[in-house]
Amino acid sequence: MKVVSSLKSLKKRDKDCQIVKRRGKIFVINKKNKRFKAKQG
């Protein structure tokens, strides 16, 4: 999982990426290709 300050560019890496908010943190997840994961912070 990558940790970045801005998730906008990482959301565009794949068309199935989606942004979710869990426990007060923002994540990019991808259910079809699990390697596209990122966390903001």
From Swiss-Prot:
GO biological process, one term: translation
One GO term describing the cellular component: ribonucleoprotein complex
UniProt keyword list: Ribonucleoprotein, Ribosomal protein
Keyword Ribosomal protein attached: yes
Keyword Ribosomal protein (UniProt): yes
SUPFAM superfamilies xrefs: Ribosomal protein L36
Superkingdom as given in the UniProt entry: Bacteria
GO molecular function ontology, one term from the record: structural constituent of ribosome
Similarity annotation: Belongs to the bacterial ribosomal protein bL36 family.
HAMAP family hit by this protein: Ribosomal_bL36
Protein name, entry field: Large ribosomal subunit protein bL36
Source taxonomy: Bacteria, Pseudomonadati, Pseudomonadota, Alphaproteobacteria, Rickettsiales
